[in-house]
Amino acid sequence: MQTVMQSEVVIVGAGLSGLAMAVTLDSAGIASTVIDRQHLPADISDISDGRTTAISYTSRRMLETLGLWPAEHAAPILDIRVTDGPSRLFLHFDHRDAGDQPMGHLIENRFLRARFQQVAKQSRNITILTGHGVSDLQRDETGVHYTLSDGSGGQARMVIGADGAKSWLRQSAGIRTSGWSYGQTAMICTIRHQLPHHNVAHERFLPGGPFAVLPLAGEYASIVWSERDALVPVMMRLDDQAFAGELLRRFDDSLGTIELAGPRSSYPLSLTVAHDIAGTRLALVGDAAHQMHPIAGQAFNLGLRDIAALAEIIVDRRRLGLDIGGDEGLSRYRRSRRVDIATLLAATDGLTWLFSNDIPPVRIARDLSLGLVNKMPRLKTMFMRSAMGTAGNGPRLLRGQHL
């Protein structure tokens, strides 16, 4: 085997989480090698699949600190309005009740990927190897030794799995998962609308699943329509005009006339959680560690919190002259993330089952709950601060501080 690369950390997966992990380590001078079997597109900002990401306030601070924030493409979320089907009761979150900052921002994934790739490729501490997957990886007390599918290989002090919900690294390490399907599929698209959205995000709970209208820059909005699996193929076969008509049936005319402004995509919705997020010289971040329903729009934010926590531990150990891939540091990472991951997954799962249930007594109870919470400003402020990520102390990067 020809050793082509030696670095302190090897990262499997060159998606958003993998590149964010590499750039975060680079900010403290730690060299990494990022590996992905897929090639990175040359100009990904021109490639749109309609997918967007909600970025919380603290996640934005982290991305700004790392130079990863594409501000020109980000739309602030100032208000959130939650309704349950045709009920007149609603829950309204106004960002001014929690401070002067937006509750979050919405941005198309293509712009995040473009910025992440640009910054990573410009770094001298980051080597990106694409087009060849990892065919073999060994972990022992001396470090990590890996072989790529082209026969080349390398060494590192530790390996980080950022290779998604079907993580090869997680499976090869023998880390089991638990989870289930929600029997729903998310249909994603971007619309152009006639009337201004005023940076208000809408989420309407329908029997088939939540229906979200999320503000993008200008006269555009992102649709995330979760629906029963059986109905999705029928909807996806409709032409654009008919599909837009189905969108209006499930929302209202507050945005005026609408039209599709790009391709549609879909993906099945499920919950998956790894039984462990660390092992011998190994750590998992992002979807490789946990995958959730998009009902709360927190999946990527949870992954960024993984990255911020893990990077802080790695950097602190390196400065102390300790082994960055040692068991003590990885145990600390495991402990630091346990409560946050478990709490958010449980809350998201509970909301999904509760609001996808059309049994009349359940529907009446949740409608009354929405109306009641809407009249409790302190509770609403607590919910907003939790969603913004400002409740409690977190890793330095989430507070806008450099490593």
PLM regions and their residue ranges:
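Conserved N-terminal helical subregion
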Residues: 3-5, 64-65, 75-172, 180-185
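N-terminal Rossmann-like FAD-binding beta1-loop-alpha1 element of flavoenzymes
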Residues: 8-34
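Conserved Rossmann-like nucleotide-cofactor binding loop
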Residues: 17, 40, 166
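Glycine-rich FAD pyrophosphate-binding loop
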Residues: 26-49
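FAD/FMN-dependent oxidoreductases across multiple families
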Residues: 233-325
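C-terminal helical "tail/cap" subdomain of flavin- and related membrane-associated enzymes
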Residues: 312-403
